[in-house]
Amino acid sequence: MPEATEHPPIGEAQTEPAQSGCPMVIKPPVEGGSNRDWWPNAVNLKMLQKDPEVIDPMDEGYDYREAVQTLDVDQLARDFDELCTNSQDWWPADFGHYGPLFIRMSWHAAGTYRVQDGRGGAGKGMQRFAPLNSWPDNVSLDKARRLLWPLKKKYGKKLSWSDLIVYAGNRAMENMGFKTAGFAFGRPDYWEPEEDVYWGAEHEWLGSQDRYAGANGDRTKLENPLGASHMGLIYVNPEGPEGNPDPIAAAIDIRETFGRMAMNDVETAALIVGGHTFGKTHGATDIVNGPEPEAAPLEQMGLGWSNPGVGIDTVSSGLEVTWTHTPTKWDNSFLEILYGNEWELFKSPAGANQWRPKDNGWANSVPMAQGTGKTHPAMLTTDLSMRMDPIYGEITRRWLDHPEELAEEYAKAWFKLLHRDMGPVQRYLGPLVPTQTWLWQDIVPAGKPLSDADVATLKGAIADSGLTVQQLVSTAWKAASSFRISDMRGGANGGRIRLQPQLGWESNEPDELAQVISKLEEIQGSSGIDVSFADLVVLGGNVGIETAAKAAGFDIEVPFSSGRGDATQEQTDVEAFSYLEPKADGFRNYVGKGLNLPAEYQLIDQANLLNLSAPQMTVLIGGLRALGITHGDSKLGVLTDTPGQLTNDYFVNLTDMGVKWAPAPADDGTYVGTDRDTGEVKYTASRVDLLFGSNSQLRALAEVYAEDDSRDKFVKDFVAAWVNVMDADRYDIGKGA
């Protein structure tokens, strides 16, 4: 709503020279200063600090997902409905109803989701924190959250802010006559801003120059993984691209940005038409707002954008638009007005481009937000896109005559908007969860648990299959490492490694993968055991690790949780899953084409999306290298004379001062390790490998595993980290990351 090239998140340095002549402006730590002021190109390992208990104020043992199931949802709805029409003098309700404000709040919380990396969304309550709480597109949503405080205060630990922020918009629409598709609770609160989300390189609000750099005017060339056309907007500039009031050009931005939120044309049109059935925008005067919440004075107590105007004089986006004559009621009047008039451009009182009916059409048909006055309807440039763009126009013209279809599509799109980042349906809680499922939910049929005897039989069959340690471990890793904690998609459950698009990913080495799949399917069919392919893949990886450990002198059993299910190709959205394809996999020394950042940065981002800590990332790298798990069977980074054995050789040789490293003569980003005395070539390695010897923090971890008394610890820690990755998506048994 309007009030509103790959790049992993790396901190930006402050490079303006100080008056003293120092080339950096260094601040005390309490003001945000850090080592990164001096060394801005260092990898950001803070992304891998996984200890939420340190900042979580809840008591030990508190589980929000248990607490929310004791919530009286019916009473919450009654309390919310009463709050919606209880206008407060400090922030009066437009049209006597806070519902439209809450819809915008929910939309803007969920609408930050982007499909490329799964980040954003409402699932962690990030709208409460910087930078989102201070984005220019979120003006006045601080008031919306403050209005909800009585409900949050009353229900306490049973209701998270994360759930309440999106529930509010959902219930508001029901209160105003719309039948939603349902609602799922289950979003726990986080207690600090996410520092791992890249929102763009611009250093000013509403800037766009960096995200379209090199695009030569092609608005579809928005930098990945960004989902908005301007810094600080949820989607697009409602006045049109760069303020140009061209509805056709605006449609290009709309299609690109909504598509990056995983919405197709029908869903996009439904969200805009349905959402703009309610409420208004605010630009009643040319008053300039005060600073945003993060920059506001202490006495404003977390609120921002202060100005003398409230109620009818409120200024948020600077656009002054009321779309319909029934702004607190669900109906088809948005489309009736959009198609029932020809439109002319004019300026809002705040100077923003917007549209009104020609020839004073529909004058005095739209209520004022406060009082009893009347005015004319108005539209945004992006609203006119819903009529003038050929694709959107065909969709919305049909809805003009078939409003029941609009209602159905809006209900589905709204539910998707609010729940896209929640992961599998096993995470949906509460009495309002719909029984219907949709393709975008990545449904996995329930699997069957295996007995210990079944597991033993299958492990024997896998061990006798002729598949190598490298084939077994690599296939399990490829399947499980598709998981990302950001939106809890991917992983081994579902067995989609054998389906398109994963079967054809370059990173998955399709020809080699097909051979392994064929052999595992043969075992699945001949074993006489009702086992899923997904379970076999993970079990195969475990067999490979146990075999490699035994060869190194360690008799271990890798923990295994059975019960994974197998999805079908028909249950798999090929386009949606294509976004999970790794551009690089540092754990296997794979680097794809077209990356504009070095592989070590990609590794940190990948480890973060796998929900790994720095020690877990480190031990996994060392173990996989020792096993010879590399893309294309490369020897790059295999710093051992016994590949296929689970030893700590990788760390021993990486930290050996008898090995001298230098860039490879081919200047291809790889390195050659030679004997410091003889000059004999001993190993080759990648930038990822040398990171663990050059970065001071990672070297400290590597040294732990290189020590003579750490061989047992290395094996134990590797197995534990491996199991974490294999089970990262097991929300069906309460083990998910």
UniProtKB/Swiss-Prot annotation:
Cystine pairs: none
EC number per UniProt: 1.11.1.21
Tryptophyl-tyrosyl-methioninium (Tyr-Met) (with W-107) crosslink site(s): 235-261
Cross-link (Tryptophyl-tyrosyl-methioninium (Trp-Tyr) (with M-261)): 107-235
Domain of life: Bacteria
UniProt-annotated catalytic positions: 108 (proton acceptor)
Free-text description of this protein's post-translational modifications in UniProt: Formation of the three residue Trp-Tyr-Met cross-link is important for the catalase, but not the peroxidase activity of the enzyme.
A Pfam family per the record: peroxidase
Cofactor note as given: Binds 1 heme b (iron(II)-protoporphyrin IX) group per dimer.
Region of interest called Disordered, as start-end residue ranges on this chain: 1-33
Residues of the site described as Transition state stabilizer: 104
Binding site for heme: 276
Keyword Ribonucleoprotein: no
GO MF annotation list: catalase activity; heme binding; metal ion binding
SUPFAM superfamilies attached to this UniProt entry: Heme-dependent peroxidases (SSF48113)
Keywords from the UniProt entry: Heme, Hydrogen peroxide, Iron, Metal-binding, Oxidoreductase, Peroxidase
Subunit-structure text: Homodimer or homotetramer.
Similarity comment: family membership: Belongs to the peroxidase family. Peroxidase/catalase subfamily.
Role of this protein: Bifunctional enzyme with both catalase and broad-spectrum peroxidase activity.
Protein name (Swiss-Prot/TrEMBL): Catalase-peroxidase 2
Organism, as annotated: Mycolicibacterium vanbaalenii (strain DSM 7251 / JCM 13017 / BCRC 16820 / KCTC 9966 / NRRL B-24157 / PYR-1)
Name of the coding gene: katG2
